[in-house]
Amino acid sequence: MMHSIINDRAKTDNGTKYAGIRILAVLFWIAIWQFASMYLKQEILLASPVSVVRKLFELIFSGNFWQSVGFSFVRIVTGFLLAVLLGIFLAVWAYWSKTVEILIAPVIAVVKSTPVASFIILCLIWIPSKNLSVFISFLMVLPVIYTNILEGIRQTDRKILEMAKVFRVNLRRQIRYIYVSQVLPYFLSACRLSLGMCWKAGVAAEVIGVPSGSIGEKLYNAKIYLNTPDLFAWTIVIIVISFVFEKCFLGIVSRVVYMIEHR
């Protein structure tokens, strides 16, 4: 008991220590940014942190800020969730059918190797610009989810599966108690990787397609009018939204898996 308490305290102390170091690291790079801005003395080249924060607060309290955030958030997250669902389905299907895996392989290879800009320009011909970010986000996430889930299923411990077969454990219980826990690390890893990708690709699609009322439109206008503080402020907004959504989504997934395994 005493040993457990000491370990918990040590972990807490380490967590506090590293949290402090992370904060100092952020402050260090903000200071470098400020000094670089002061040295250049041209906001058009590098806006200072102070002007960016000021602009950020102006945006937050402006009328159409939340509309733009909502517009992009709904579409990019929709693309991500659709890719997750289809990626899991295709991975399970490919695991049970080699023919399906062979059929899917060329498509996954093409999507992986084709530049995002090429897809965006091609898709502008077929898809309205307001829905372009949905499809591009979906396209960038699908191969990552599919590949990781398929690999996770393949790496499931064969001895455990043989034991389940010997004791005649039905497929539903195998999925619940064996496959879910074995595949979860691969799924979480895929989500961490693809969440950043989907936001970068989705916003890039909006910058090129320029749908009205999107974050991409705001970035495009900031570039056209050489409004560097605006550009930095919207970039920070994208980073924060992406970070918060990632933490929330992964937390929900972990909670759902825990409930499934311990129900």
Question: Which residues does each predicted region cover?
Answer:
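Periplasmic/extracellular loop-to-transmembrane helix junction in inner-membrane transport proteins
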Residues: 38-81
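C-terminal transmembrane helix and the adjacent membrane-cytosol boundary/short C-terminal tail
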Residues: 98, 189, 233-263
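Transmembrane-helix boundary motif in ABC transporter permease subunits
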Residues: 78-108
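Transmembrane alpha-helical segments of polytopic membrane transport and secretion proteins
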Residues: 1-27, 247-263
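Non-cytoplasmic
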Residues: 190-240
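Short cytoplasmic-facing helical segments at TM-TM junctions of multi-pass membrane proteins
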Residues: 151-187, 219
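Generic hydrophobic transmembrane alpha-helix motif, especially the helices
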Residues: 109-144, 151-152
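Transmembrane alpha-helices
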Residues: 135, 139, 172-204, 233
